[in-house]
Structures are given as structure tokens and as C-alpha cells.
Amino acid sequence: MISYIIYNLSSIIYNLSSIIYSLSSLSSLENKIMEVQFDKTKTLNALLFVANRVQRKDFHKIFKIIYFADRQHLADWGRPITGDTYVAMEAGPVPSRLYDMLKMVRGDSYMPDSEGLSQYFQIENWMYVKPLQDADLNRLSPNEQEALSDAIAKYASLSYDQIKEKSHDVAWRSTARDFSISWDNIAREAGLDGEELECLNEYARLEAALS
């Protein structure tokens, strides 16, 4: 009887170990983050590109249009335009580095506008971008311009609630509020499968090693 109990306990422990190992492997796979680099120059020019081409230039609309453009460019070309870190806020994804840039110019950032961003745009009524220059198109590839133009065409005319709902995609819903959305999840939302995602990660690692 005791031998039988010991045997069963051993089997249970073995099965639990297998489950824990499987969960650990799955967690490792799920937490594999795409190695995306933030590009401040492209982000600034994406902002100017959008702000000069939409009628309503509020933060919310601009943030969402750039998010959709980043997502589409990732699907089409294997990398986003800006490489920003999107935070899953209640109203949808917010590009945190771009938001910091806007706050520098607005004057409520803990960082001063030491790089002279105010020569490119101003902030009016706390939440509207007034572009002072157009985008430097030499800083945005034709494919990046196309992704931004497509996002403007699809989403610029939507209301606040409509574009908010569109931005509440699977990548946003799978992330806790006020946490960063992983680029892996954005890639899956863009339609990339696991094999394509692994290829992108491998390419990013090789590119980083050669840079």
C-alpha cells in the first residue's frame, strides 16, 4: 500500500514538473520581445507629417494614427516607423516617447526642451499640435510615408469614440492598463505568425550585432 502511494506521488510530482517546465517554456516564448529601437528623428517627422495633414490635431487622434501606421508598416516591412513604446491607456495605445516630446514643448515635462523641439511645433489649448514646419520627407522612406498616408485616409475622419474603439485591438486588450504593449503582440495583431515573428527577432539580433 505504501509503495503504491509512493509510486502515485512520484507520478504526480513528475507530471507537475512537466507542466511547470512547459509553462516556463511557453512563458519564455510569450515574453520574447521584439528588439525595436526608438527613432526620435522619424518620430518627430511622423508627427509633423500627420499634424500637417489632419484637420483635428489633438493628441489622441495623432497618437492613434501613428500607432496604426506603425502597426501596418510592421506588417508590411518587418519593422515599425517610430519604434516607440506604446502604453495601453484607457483611451487606447499612447506612444510614450512622443508624448514626452509633446510635454517638453508644452512645459509640463520633468525634462526641458533642450533639443529645440519648439521650433518644429507648438501646443495649443493643452492638447492640440500646431506644426510650424512640414515633415522632412528625406527622413521618412516612401514606404513609411505611404503607411502614414494610409492611416490618415482610414482614420482621420473618425470621431474620438470611433478611433478609440478601433485602437482597442487584441494587442491593447491583452495588456494591463498603463503597461507597455509588447511589440510581439502588436506584430501578432498586424497578422504576423510565430515563424515570421521569430525571423524578425533573429534579423533584429543580427542587425544589432553588426551595428
Ranges and model annotations:
Residues I5-Y7, Y14, S18-S211:
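Domain-edge interaction signal
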